[in-house]
Amino acid sequence: MVNSNQNQNGNSNGHDDDFPQDSITEPEHMRKLFIGGLDYRTTDENLKAHFEKWGNIVDVVVMKDPRTKRSRGFGFITYSHSSMIDEAQKSRPHKIDGRVVEPKRAVPRQDIDSPNAGATVKKLFVGALKDDHDEQSIRDYFQHFGNIVDINIVIDKETGKKRGFAFVEFDDYDPVDKVVLQKQHQLNGKMVDVKKALPKQNDQQGGGGGRGGPGGRAGGNRGNMGGGNYGNQNGGGNWNNGGNNWGNNRGGNDNWGNNSFGGGGGGGGGYGGGNNSWGNNNPWDNGNGGGNFGGGGNNWNNGGNDFGGYQQNYGGGPQRGGGNFNNNRMQPYQGGGGFKAGGGNQGNYGGNNQGFNNGGNNRRY
């Protein structure tokens, strides 16, 4: 059953209280699906009715504006088991209330600040490879996540030796998301590092903006949080700056470590990719202005509120406990008139900024 309760942030949360929570053995982020591009008429009930075809749903929510109580055009589905997400993703495309929606595995809250956490890509970077990691061993392992179309083990042109990393390309973005969510991977008994591989041109999009200015929001052009001043935490428009060195200490272009992809706020990444306009067809959207939630032109109808490049700035979505994972579900927005975020960034729309700024007036929601 769906219990629709209005909480302080104006969201309608549906939770199946009849499901035995002690039967859940996986972390919530492994069972949670982000749904973008929702029609403004879609309710918790409609969302659940569609996705329960692929498994038991323990939580469902269509995110709403805390003031207007209107849909923001996206929501979350939490299943009782991660395999149900696999089945739902195999059944794409999904159409709800006459509109094709874009489901994507939700990013864990601890990974929100990663510059490429919400990117939609089909190529996977695999680092820390050893000499015994050949193409076949890589294929044998990663083919369980999806259909592989190409494997490229990078070789030093001068010495002919392996440089310690490779790229695995799938025919879909979902296998990449699933691999990255799992985090720890062993090939031939040895741990390897996995990350989303972003094209170089993605580093250049988004323009100025930055994170400065009142309320911790964009200082330059509102709506441009990515590109040069925000996502490129390691400098430059280059994949190969900073992080762990997988290239035999060569430096320069051999660095493929933490945050080494730069990222920025643009380029088809984020939740939705491309130039999808989330919510601009809703009757209350006229004149609301920008509000980038995903980079690459993905507009989430937030009246000029910049949601920070393509980082997962919805805070990973509302959390509900299952088994030993997040048993205490905190209200995403707690407190009085200011709706100041509480509970360790539970459900915040703004990454590091603990909430989002209402059109630059320094009032926090």
Curated annotation (Swiss-Prot):
Compartmental location = Nucleus
Record-level Gene Ontology MF annotations: mRNA 3'-UTR binding; mRNA 5'-UTR binding; mRNA binding; poly(G) binding; sequence-specific DNA binding
Q: Where is this region: Disordered?
A: 1-24, 191-261, 276-365
Which GO terms of type biological process are on file? compound eye morphogenesis; female germ-line stem cell population maintenance; negative regulation of RNA splicing; oogenesis; positive regulation of mRNA splicing, via spliceosome; positive regulation of translation; regulation of alternative mRNA splicing, via spliceosome
Q: From what superkingdom does this record's organism come?
A: Eukaryota
Residue ranges annotated as compositionally biased, kind Gly residues, are 205-240, 287-298, 314-324, 334-353
Tell me the PROSITE patterns matching this sequence.
RRM
Which residue positions does the secretion signal occupy?
Answer: none
Q: Where is the RRM domain?
A: 31-107, 122-199
Q: Does the keyword Signal apply?
A: no
Q: Cellular component terms, GO, for this chain's entry?
A: nucleus; polytene chromosome puff; ribonucleoprotein complex
Give me the segments passing through the membrane: none
Give the record's keywords alphabetically. Nucleus, Repeat, Ribonucleoprotein, RNA-binding
Instruction: Give the InterPro entries listed for this entry.
Output: Nucleotide-bd_a/b_plait_sf, RBD_domain_sf, RRM_dom
Where in the sequence does UniProt note compositional bias of the Low complexity kind? 1-13, 241-259, 277-286, 299-313, 354-365
Q: What does this protein do?
A: This protein is a component of ribonucleosomes.
Annotated protein name in UniProt: Heterogeneous nuclear ribonucleoprotein A1
Protein's gene: Hrb98DE
